[in-house]
UniProtKB/Swiss-Prot annotation:
Family in the record: Belongs to the HPF1 family.
The organism of origin for this protein: Nematostella vectensis (Starlet sea anemone)
Signal peptide boundaries: none
Primary localization class, coarse: nucleus
Annotated GO MF terms: histone binding; poly-ADP-D-ribose binding
InterPro entries given in the database record: HPF1
Cellular component aspect of the GO annotation: chromosome; nucleus
Subcellular compartments: Chromosome; Nucleus
Pfam families xref list: HPF1
Protein name, per record: Histone PARylation factor 1
Length: 327
């Protein structure tokens, strides 16, 4: 989130004392630079629960800080390198998404950063209910706005006066801290709107993809089917008992794969990325081999090698029951 607010906030002593060490360790483990709000949000949670900051939101919101936050708690000490990108990676999480907060286990609710480019700062914070669907909801530009969005939504549903009071108290503290640090609490900001204009396709997960397109309009070409048509095609392949219909749908998918090959030859790498992510979001293991034909290559062609590695690791371990890789 390069554009956190209209004003460049001044660094304060609320930042973690060992932040430089944490930054280095997270970079080594996750190959990612975390935005400032990641550390400031930890400091905010430390104020709420000095002993266990990761559990500061548990009683009121049922949320726990996880993922790279586990570096700060020491939970990832001794973890094998191959496991870092699987740590709290849910079933429908694309490589662009990194979980930092987990919630309702019944629905698989979790919150994380979304990056278009692996080495860039996140473009927004999103949430997903992994046991409900692949769709992601943009809930803010930083973790303060994301939590504020969650609190506001919870206040609409909760009738218990005591719970409402606790939520309002936390929201007041959150708003005060966000204003102090000059973080926007808006769900949609100018930076997010600007990014939306660059989105080539929303994809089935709705967070969208952004790939560079040059002045000659080379870089992306749309799929030749709509989302609805693609889902119908994939559903026919996986569920239909009619062999003729199944074969027809399989031929249609093969045609799409051929179009992607043509697109790659002509520099439109975004088409393979879109189709690969849509197959991933559909969720059937039947398409895992096809996804492996599409996504690693698309990411490599786009210079996003880290994402190629993540999708391969994820598909190999997608059905695992234990999402935490910590011992």
């Amino acid at each position: 989130m390069a554009e956190v607010s209209s004003k460049r906030r001044k660094r304060t002593k609320t930042d973690i004392g060992c932040q430089s060490s944490a930054i280095k360790k997270i970079k080594e483990m996750f190959d990612a630079v975390m935005p400032e709000d990641f550390y400031d949000f930890w400091a905010f949670c430390e104020e709420l629960n000095p002993k266990n900051p990761e559990d500061a939101l548990m009683d009121t919101m049922g949320l726990q800080l996880v993922g790279p936050y586990d570096v700060l708690t020491g939970k990832l000490d001794g973890l094998s390198e191959s496991s870092y990108h699987l740590h709290w990676r849910y079933y429908y999480d694309p490589p662009e998404f990194m979980t930092v907060i987990r919630g309702n286990e019944d629905q698989g609710f979790h919150i994380g950063y979304y990056r278009d480019e692996p080495q860039a700062l996140p473009v927004f914070v999103a949430s997903n209910k992994a046991k409900v669907s692949c769709e992601m909801s943009v809930i803010g530009e930083n973790l303060f706005s994301a939590l504020n969005t969650c609190i506001t939504e919870n206040l609409k549903k909760i009738k218990d006066k005591s719970q409402q009071s606790s939520l309002k108290k936390m929201q007041t503290s959150l708003i005060t801290k966000a204003k102090e640090l000059q973080y926007s609490l808006a769900t949609t900001t100018p930076a997010i709107k600007a990014r939306n204009k660059k989105v080539n396709s929303k994809t089935l997960h709705k967070a969208g993809i952004v790939v560079p397109v040059n002045a000659m309009d080379v870089g992306y070409r749309p799929l030749t089917v709509t989302d609805a048509e693609l889902k119908k095609m994939l559903k026919t392949i996986t569920e239909s008992e009619n062999k003729s219909a199944k074969d027809k749908a399989s031929d249609e998918l093969q045609e799409l794969l051929t179009f992607v090959q043509f697109a790659n030859d002509e520099g439109d790498y975004g088409m393979g990325l879109e189709l690969g992510l849509d197959l991933f979001c559909f969720g059937s293991k039947q398409f895992h081999n096809t996804i492996l034909q599409l996504l690693p290559l698309a990411y490599q062609l786009l210079g996003r090698e880290k994402y190629a590695k993540i999708i391969q690791e994820h598909l190999e371990n997608r059905d695992r029951e234990k999402l935490s890789e910590a011992s």
